[in-house]
């Protein structure tokens, strides 16, 4: 249950050969092209078809789904409830909340594509179901836990084995989801910008909400990173700020006391409900004046002031990571 329901949520970032001067004067055109290329948001209600799902998934989504389908068949043969989810048609889509796609500039004015998303509807369904199952399995001992949400499976039990397989599949789905989105954002860039460009660096694709087996202090253990990124020595990671603040490409320093981990971002200083009560559309417009993005009432909960100061966060973890690039967004797409 410590992983929660947004299994495999994480970041993807890629540097291009484009510079700020290559971007169109009217960035709204670029934002519209990205919004057309990647389904985002959702339709009110719980229908299987929503605004955030594909009606007819493109070929690259089919290709990614083919790598996931065999294990999904095993999962649904034992747990057929997962057939009744947006699985295939959510692959390569953004979602809502704090998930985003951004076009950023680094300190050398080079253009980066950066995005944040996870395992979408199917990951939520897997997480919710197995959390409820763990709570039922622990019914007699649940009172001994500080929170029902920390219910767990005993290693070696049937449900433990099934959960490990299911969560691993959802993490693979999340990684493929980000890869498919990145491909389609790059297509949107090529359609919008006349100048040919190349990809300068290999994409960084990192989870910040996941579990995996690792070696620490001479033992093989399961490490859960909830809002944390793996930061082994020399390992690249991505630490985003809010939609109006800086983000960072980092190299891990391999600090053993943190289990080779670092924070995944700024983190909120207030709830979404409080942000909506405290701030107005005018506040959002002022805070994101330098960004081509939505500035309506439905994204006030994502206003930069609802998040911690990212510079303070980075200073607090200077023994965990080294900053390689500092990015500032010029286009931001939210669901």
Describe the residue ranges of each PLM region.
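Short, polar/flexible loop-turn hinges at active-site or ligand-entry regions and domain interfaces
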Residues: 21-23
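Active-site cofactor/substrate anionic-group-binding motifs, chiefly glycine-
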Residues: 1-8, 12
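Acidic, low-complexity central loop/insert segments
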Residues: 16-19
